[in-house]
Each structure stands twice: as structure tokens, then as C-alpha cells.
């Protein structure tokens, strides 16, 4: 089964890990976000990029945009704690239709506290669903979690986090991705970047405006696995327009 995930695991290096395995980056000390751009030439956009993520979503322009067109299919999943986040790699069949293009879900992972903010509000947890089209272009759907009732899908995921960093485990009880999302799929849209090195730009960001809940225990459980916050600070908009 693990062979099925070789591509997904390679992709994870682009989304949640370094472009160069020899370069250590993280969220604390000399490898923290303030230093990413100087750690490697590959990471220069982390310092010089003008369309970086995350952002504080304020004064969004009200505009007509297409509703999210998502399709879900049950399949195999694999969960890994890569030292930067807890990530779930998924098999094919989960798609997003956007701008007349089909994007396939590659993986989803989490940040605590949230990276993006809405009207200056930071949430205790944020999920990123990373989609990729046939040309390699990426779209990220961001989901905010606010403290409240326990989340059944997070409970399923957290119970299966591997004990060791970089250990991948087949998910015995698959996480129901659709059930993880809110019933309302209204969203903010802007152009941004990966929030981890190499901070590549040209990423389509769709931030859902309706949060879902997670219990304080679930939020703390994730934080205890990470041992530190894993959020990049807010980046300047530099004139970018956010639509809603």
C-alpha cells in the first residue's frame, strides 16, 4: 500500500518541507521564519517575494465568484508527522473544479495557531487542503477551527498520528474529508505563496469564511505533538486584492 503514496510523499516535500534536505528550517531559533530567506538561495522568495502567504484578510472586495465545486471519493490515506506538521496524504479521486481547471487533492495538513487571519482574528488551528492540476499549479483551501465541540474527524486523525517523526502510517480508519468541511463553502480568494520554504508564489488561496470547531483538548493534542507553534507570521499584501 505504501507504494501508492510514493508520489504523494514526494509532493509533501514541496508543501511542508525543505526544497533541500540539507537545509534545516523550522519555527524556532536560527531556522525560524525570519531567517528562512537566508538559509538557502532556494528560499530567497521567503524574504524577497511580494505575494507571500499568510495574510490578514481585511476589506475584501465583494464580487461574484463561482461556488466551490468539490468532489470526494473514499480511498486510502497515509498520515505522517514530518516535524513541521501533521499531514495526511490521500489517494486520487478528490477534486476541485476552479477556473475551468481540475485540481486533485494531494494532502492536507495543519497549523497551530492559524496562519491566515480574518479581520485581525487568529484562530487556534488551521487546515490546508493542497490541490494540484495537470500543469503542476497549486490551489490551497484553508479551513479555520475555533474552540468548541470536539471534531469527530480530527479525533479520527489524531488517534492515528505516528509516534515518531517522519514515520508514515497507513490510516486504518479514513478521515471523511467532506465531513471535515463546513456546510457553507463561501470563501475569500487571493494570490499567494506556500507558507513554508521555498515560499513559491503563484498559489491560488481559497480561505473558507465559516470555521468549524475543535475542542480545547484536540487543539492542545496537536500542539503537544508539534512541541512548538508551526505558523508563519502574517505577510504584507503589497497591493493585492482579496475577493469575497
Curated annotation (Swiss-Prot):
GO cellular component: periplasmic space
Keyword field contains Zinc: yes
Entry's EC annotation: 4.2.1.1
Domain (Alpha-carbonic anhydrase): residue spans on this chain: 23-244
Cofactor: Zn(2+)
UniProt subcellular location: Periplasm
Binding site for Zn(2+): 109, 111, 128
Active-site residues, as the UniProt record annotates them: 84 (proton acceptor)
Leader sequence residues: 1-19
EC primary class: lyase
Binding sites annotated in the UniProt record for substrate: 195-196
Chemical reaction(s) catalysed: hydrogencarbonate + H(+) = CO2 + H2O
Pfam families in the cross-refs: Carb_anhydrase
Disulfide pattern: 46-199
Keywords tagged on the record: Disulfide bond, Lyase, Metal-binding, Periplasm, Signal, Zinc
GO molecular function: carbonate dehydratase activity; zinc ion binding
Protein family according to the UniProt entry: Belongs to the alpha-carbonic anhydrase family.
Classification via PANTHER family: CARBONIC ANHYDRASE
Function field: Reversible hydration of carbon dioxide.
Protein name according to UniProt: Carbonic anhydrase
Organism, scientific name: Pectobacterium atrosepticum (strain SCRI 1043 / ATCC BAA-672)
